[in-house]
Amino acid sequence: MPRGAQAMLEKQADSVWNQLYEICWNFYVKNVWDINTFKAIVDKIEKSDDKQLIRFLIWFNDARKRSNFNDKFQWMTSFLYGRRYPPLGDDLVVKEPWNDLQQLDSIIKYGNEPIDLVKMQPDFTTEERIVQNRRVNNCSLICSLTNAREENQIKSYSVHNVFNVILHFNGSNRLVSVLRDSNFPKCSKDGAALTLFSHNIEDMLIELAYFEIKNNRNYAYGGSNTATDTYLLTGWIPEILNLGDVSFSEIRKCYQFNAMLALGTDSVKGKEVTENHDFVVTSVNWKKEQFTILNPHGTENPTVYTWDDLIKEFKWLYVNWDPYSKYTQRVKLHDRYPDKFNAYPTWTQKPLMCIENKSNSIQNCHLYLERHLLDDSILESNLTIGEIPRSGFTAVSAEGNNSGFCNMQLRLNPHETRLIFYHSDKKCNLTFHLLSNSGLVSMSKCKSDILTAESSWNITNNQWTIGTSEYFKSPVFKLKSDGFDDTYLDFELVSQLPAKVNFQIFESDDYALQRPIFKNDTYSPQIFSKHGVRLLKGREYFIVCSIAHHITSPFIFTLRNPETKQSKFELSPYSLGFGGLRYNEVLRCKTRITISVSNFTRLFVLLFTSASKTNGRLTLRLYEKETEEILFEQIETRYDLSVKPFPIPNIELKPASYVLEIFYNADVVICNLGTSHRAIFESDL
């Protein structure tokens, strides 16, 4: 075939590849499916002799028919820095890149330093190993690449002038392509190279792909860690262990399965090794408890450390292990974590994951949580995973770090279900990887068994603590239950802003709030909880939520029933100061209030004073004005309305005029008056 004709066919094939890419992208990411466009591309491909193109078409046609949320989520999270990184492995060869590689070749940077972009050749002047360029802060990548090469875990292939490497991020294998003859940076000032040193040009291309993903092709990098970078290169599960918290036998147990090891130092000075630096573990002598360590700087020979010396010099052990050496099953579940989950510092407001063992045998599982990469890298942002307790609000376990991943080991009894909560300091996308040895172990999102009510403290209700006459003005909830037995509940009060908080529970006939069902007037920082509170059957309760300082803040009140036998509960706001009645009035009086009603109505009265101690004789009388029929009368020889409000609850009134007389040793008494229908009140002040 003439050379010109061959070039024309290749150009047409390239065009078909890109058209098929767009159809695929539109289907998964934009949720657009044009059957006519698809049929047209099928006709073109059927006339082609490109086996890879035909294979990709067959794969896509099958995949789209069985696609689910997870599949679409993996494609929707393929976008990074405005570029596409499809969830494809090395088993599905593509002939065209998904991004404009020529344009990418021009955006390489080294911070704000002036650089020249040049073609580079492998470095045959160094030893036959990968060596870090000290001007570039990527010791973790060099350690990871060294280990991955040794374990033959780099997945890559080349087509024409494109080098394709499979990296692992955003919950999937992902295709990253760079030009085989890519430009590389050199310092303009002294001509020094800014790439790693290796006999293999592909190591330099992998470094370029790494910086494309991690730092938008900027070689001025803040650094990472070997566990994270090894996962990026190989997909092997990462773990970071503090050497001070593990024993030599535990490390040996890690190594029983295919594993890659590296070490990291901290910022403590005065040690022999470089601070804040990662090192490769090239071998371990298990009998002598000796580790052979290699510095990625390449200026030192491998050094042998005993276990005792190792824990003195190094801080971190980075372990990456092959998931398929321990487990046969892998299930993934993707999720988004929005800011709203961080409104309150409690797991009760976090999303939950349910891990269930449906088999008849004990199952050992591993849960790995991965945070997705974003254009603006999330630095110093913690990711936390924990297990919800059977009762109460203290997590069974909760481990977190800022590495971008979390791990949890689970041992599930037959037919056991465990609930896991997860947290991120910042909004992000996440992927759960559940590893097990049974297809009967499943993972799903779920809802908690808690009941939550939300309210807020403001200038009208944040000034009265326990023991004050106006304590009832604090936010109040009324709790109802349809249970036929006594029950034990767990309660938690959480302020959104830092503040000292407390709640007390009273039976619903205790309008004066003098008999809490548990006595605890301590105010706790931001969270106040009580476990195993006994509530009697058939009773209703008031829950008063107060704050120690005059702070304006939203809060949540949470109820949890740990018992297997569930009852239904209703938690609703309640205006305790007015008996929960619709119409409210506050009057100041000396000795007399006149009440005029035109409909049958229910009356609630609450008397108190805001003055200092007023302990003395209190006489109350409510009577119909015309007939002088007494509806309520009570005398208290010693009563202090400045501490203990006095309630007159639920008096039924017919249409008429009434008089409420109050004899007390205070200049002014404040009266809260609640009615179910409108009424007219007149005070003698």
UniProtKB/Swiss-Prot annotation:
Record function comment: Required for the proteolytic cleavage of the transcription factor RIM101 in response to alkaline ambient pH.
Highest taxon in the source lineage: Eukaryota
Active site: 139, 277, 295
GO molecular function: cysteine-type endopeptidase activity
Keywords: Hydrolase, Protease, Thiol protease
Descriptive protein name: Calpain-like protease palB/RIM13
Domain Calpain catalytic: 82-323
GO biological process: proteolysis
EC number annotated for this UniProt entry: 3.4.22.-
Keyword 4Fe-4S annotated: no
SUPFAM superfamilies: Cysteine proteinases (SSF54001)
Keyword check for Transmembrane: no
Membership in a protein family: Belongs to the peptidase C2 family. PalB/RIM13 subfamily.
InterPro entries from the UniProt entry: PalB/RIM13_Calpain-like, Papain-like_cys_pep_sf
